[in-house]
Amino acid sequence: MARLLRALRGLPLLQAPGRLARGCAGSGSKDTGSLTKSKRSLSEADWQKKLTPEQFYVTREKGTEAPFSGMYLNNKETGMYHCVCCDSPLFSSEKKYCSGTGWPSFSEAYGSKGSDESHTGILRRLDTSLGCPRMEVVCKQCEAHLGHVFPDGPKPTGQRFCINSVALKFKPSKP
């Protein structure tokens, strides 16, 4: 636990504009100025029409799919994982690995340059909903809840992005 807290202290936190996060996994903090207005301005009713009930629960209400239930957990195809809500590219299959946790795991987000995630499709937000701090991962374009990132992944990044399959859309590489 102490190792996790030390790792979280070193990560940049993003501040919030406006509305509070709903559901059990959010701290209510949001980033400023990095979200595309057209993607995040959909109403709750519009998201419910666009998404399946499970996709809506996970991405818009900050839920979590059951471990070992996701369609991409054992996917070994080469390609890119996109946001199911807005189609933003998020993770490459090149950085996917088996963590044994029951969710697809990635060592870094697509577009990362070392520790610089400014060119990725994700944002990190502190999540204290379960009584201990952890880092939530959301889509930069539409604020979809994707999962969490933990400091116990493989080298060289040491990160484990633990992502809900239902929040992703896989696009295989063209041969």
UniProtKB/Swiss-Prot annotation:
Pfam family, one: SelR
Family: Belongs to the MsrB Met sulfoxide reductase family.
Activity regulation note: Inhibited by high concentrations of substrate.
UniProt entry tagged with the keyword Zinc: yes
Molecular function as annotated in GO: actin binding; L-methionine-(R)-S-oxide reductase activity; peptide-methionine (R)-S-oxide reductase activity; zinc ion binding
Residues binding Zn(2+): 83, 86, 139, 142
Gene that specifies this protein: Msrb2
Name of the protein: Methionine-R-sulfoxide reductase B2, mitochondrial
InterPro entries: Met_Sox_Rdtase_MsrB, Met_Sox_Rdtase_MsrB_dom, Mss4-like_sf
Cofactor note: Binds 1 zinc ion per subunit.
Annotated GO biological process: actin filament polymerization; protein repair; response to oxidative stress
Region ranges (Disordered): 22-46
